[in-house]
């Protein structure tokens, strides 16, 4: 059986936090023996579009991925923008997962402040990057088990 090959799509709006999320995801995938590619997008709203582009590329003889890991950070500010980015990025990932039967680990974090963010991105703490990667691996296995 071949190793799963995943695409990590990371939003780099908060570089230091993105580094920590990516570190956790890479560690989890390497520990599981999976292979991966990493692409970067400007923010969380662009992550679902990048996954859709990867699907289109696979349809045109590009790289085919067994699953996807979405990594990003949305920190509440003073405007309604937080709600839009949080809700729409999650909705778009769910739409892709359901309509395309895609294994996606959602590591787009929505937090109130930097303290909450750091507690979630560090591998030594909540390791949400690793959690998202392991979720994607679990969904890949479920898809195989169900005949997908």
Swiss-Prot record:
Which residues take part in binding (2S)-2-hydroxy-3-oxobutyl phosphate?
Answer: 78-79, 120
> Would you say which domain of life the source belongs to?
Bacteria
**Where would one find the signal peptide in this protein?**
none
Name the Pfam families on file.
DMRL_synthase
User: Tell me, what is one Gene Ontology molecular-function annotation carried by this entry?
Assistant: 6,7-dimethyl-8-ribityllumazine synthase activity
- Catalyzed reaction equations: (2S)-2-hydroxy-3-oxobutyl phosphate + 5-amino-6-(D-ribitylamino)uracil = 6,7-dimethyl-8-(1-D-ribityl)lumazine + phosphate + 2 H2O + H(+)
- Under which main EC class is this enzyme filed? transferase
E.C. number: 2.5.1.78
In this chain, 5-amino-6-(D-ribitylamino)uracil is annotated as bound at 13, 44-46, 73-75, 106
Which family does the similarity line name? Answer: Belongs to the DMRL synthase family.
This chain's function reads: Catalyzes the formation of 6,7-dimethyl-8-ribityllumazine by condensation of 5-amino-6-(D-ribitylamino)uracil with 3,4-dihydroxy-2-butanone 4-phosphate. This is the penultimate step in the biosynthesis of riboflavin.
Q: What is this protein called?
A: 6,7-dimethyl-8-ribityllumazine synthase
Q: Which organism is it from?
A: Agrobacterium fabrum (strain C58 / ATCC 33970)
Organism taxonomic ancestry: Bacteria, Pseudomonadati, Pseudomonadota, Alphaproteobacteria, Hyphomicrobiales
